[in-house]
């Protein structure tokens, strides 16, 4: 909807919250230099972590910065060059939700972050399951190769 309405900044805001999982307070950390590097160093509770940017998002952010004439500093800023406030970010996203006929309660940066976290947890759960299945198959193949195709209880029952 944001692209149709030609609200590229709002489109990128939604995308960065949903794909990178950053908080609104971490938005000033999204600078042209850090986007070029492909990861955002953010502080969470005194701890420093790095948020990787997906290549598609990185390309779109760099294109946006180039079109806006930004060579350094924050990617998301007002016409005056100041960083966007929390209320301004939330208001833009909720206006988009209203235009797209999506519940405004679901169109907050916090909800988009929750979407990111839920999606990530689901992907991690799927990867864990695949790793377990792969490990089980590897053990089965190894047992067949060594000749342990039957369990000791099965051998006793066969005699």
Task: Describe the role of every protein-language-model region.
Residues 54-104:
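Active-site/catalytic core of tyrosine-dependent DNA strand-transfer enzymes
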Residues 91-125, 132, 136, 150:
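Short, basic (Lys/Arg/His-rich) helix/loop patches that form interaction surfaces
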Residues 16-29, 122-125, 134-135:
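A short, glycine-centered helix-capping/turn motif at helix boundaries
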Residues 5-6, 16, 85, 105, ...:
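Residue-level marker of regulatory loop/turn positions in helix-turn-helix DNA-binding domains and
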Residues 20, 25-60:
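Conserved tyrosine-mediated DNA breakage-rejoining catalytic core shared by Y-recombinases
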Residues 45, 131-159:
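Catalytic-site neighborhood detector that most strongly recognizes the C-terminal catalytic loop/helix
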Residues 1, 75-76, 117:
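Bulky hydrophobic/aromatic "packing anchor" residues in well-ordered structure
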Residues 1-20, 24:
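Basic, Lys/Arg- and aromatic-enriched nucleic-acid-binding interface segment
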């Amino acid at each position: 909807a944001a692209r149709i309405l030609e609200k590229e900044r709002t489109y990128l805001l939604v995308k960065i919250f949903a794909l990178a999982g950053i908080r609104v307070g971490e938005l000033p950390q999204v600078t042209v230099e850090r986007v070029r590097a492909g990861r955002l160093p953010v502080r969470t509770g005194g701890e420093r972590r790095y948020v990787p940017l997906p290549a598609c998002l990185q390309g779109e952010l760099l294109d946006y910065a180039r079109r806006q004439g930004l060579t350094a500093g924050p990617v998301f800023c007002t016409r005056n060059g100041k960083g966007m406030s929390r209320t301004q970010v939330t208001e833009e996203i909720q206006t988009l939700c209203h235009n797209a006929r999506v519940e405004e309660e679901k169109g907050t940066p916090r909800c988009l972050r929750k979407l990111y976290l839920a999606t990530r947890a689901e992907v991690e759960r799927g990867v864990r399951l695949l790793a377990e299945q792969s490990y089980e198959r590897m053990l089965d193949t190894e047992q067949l190769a060594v000749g342990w195709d039957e369990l000791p209880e099965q051998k006793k029952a066969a005699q």
